[in-house]
Amino acid sequence: YYPEHGFMWTKDAKGNWRDRFDATEWGGPFTEGSSWHWTWSVFHDPEGLSELMGGHEPMVARLDSMFVAPNTYNHGTYGFVIHEIAEMVALNMGQYAHGNQPVQHAIYLYDYIGQPWKTQYHLRNVMDKLYNSGSKGYCGDEDNGQTSAWYVFSAMGFYPVCPGMPEYAVGSPLFKKVTLHLPEGKNFVV
């Protein structure tokens, strides 16, 4: 975490911050994303990320800014506009690039820093704007089922922010009732 800029960034082999910080640069130290996206990839410790950022209020401010920042970009080491960049610009949600998987969980981080209504607001905005039964009702691509899994979990009202951990962040369900049929005849009802 680069405190001077408030984002994740990379260091060189000697431990010095890499020159020319640009939060909108895709590629370089990041795969299919920029510092705007990968800063939130502390799935296992959102509270620790909040501490790095100076507490809940600065983290909320940074998350808020992701949705309203200009959707400008620097194609960086890719040398051209990859489809993930084009999708972020077309979706027009600031630096939030929902069509690209590395940042999809970030909406749920509001749950961890005391503002779950912002999780609910952004979830509904994304689900209503980017998913439908029409020919353009599915944004981005499908890396190993992540985008559809994000939608299914979010539509049910919860999401595994940290894969492999037995906990879920609460969202805003689209359904009044969902029943998951589990092994041995058990049901989980939301």
Where are the predicted features?
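Active-site core of glycosidic bond-cleaving carbohydrate-active enzymes
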Residues: 3-174, 178-189
